[in-house]
């Protein structure tokens, strides 16, 4: 039986608590993800799926519930060092490849952020080699490292975001609508790249999207969200 890499138990994410405009963005949901699988989380805009992803990686402070990663409850991590270690294992690819890359940084420095924070390169030469290798891995040329994000297309920028996520050699990646901002012609290329990387690096994915057909294509199991609730869960060919 594969290992449960992630377990979400009774997760609640409320905003404006105690006020008239209190929002129950995620309302008592539970699911687990096995090591090596892709779990798709699908739902219309405002269903709570992206909030779930952001709460798992602790960009939001959960209102209630447990988030177990490899058996450790990450909601109990309070220190910066502990969070840095957690984000070494868990990375996120964001929906908007335009907004998620710093426009004032060169691509090589964007990709190397995690390498620098975690001290993964012992010299400038090793850092440069790691970045070049990552650019090649996502189908870009090492020479692209000297350019800025605005010089790239949406699909290329998303590849840069994927390279940044891979830089720290994570075990688990949250893909938050990684293709919805891209042209349809580019979407399949990015999905195929994610699948290739999963095989090569033994990655586990939480794949968040509103397009059920694309989620079914990439996922082993799927959860369907609506109004903060997880309404349905099962194998991708049964949803």
Region roles according to the model:
Residues 1-239:
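ABC transporter nucleotide-binding domains
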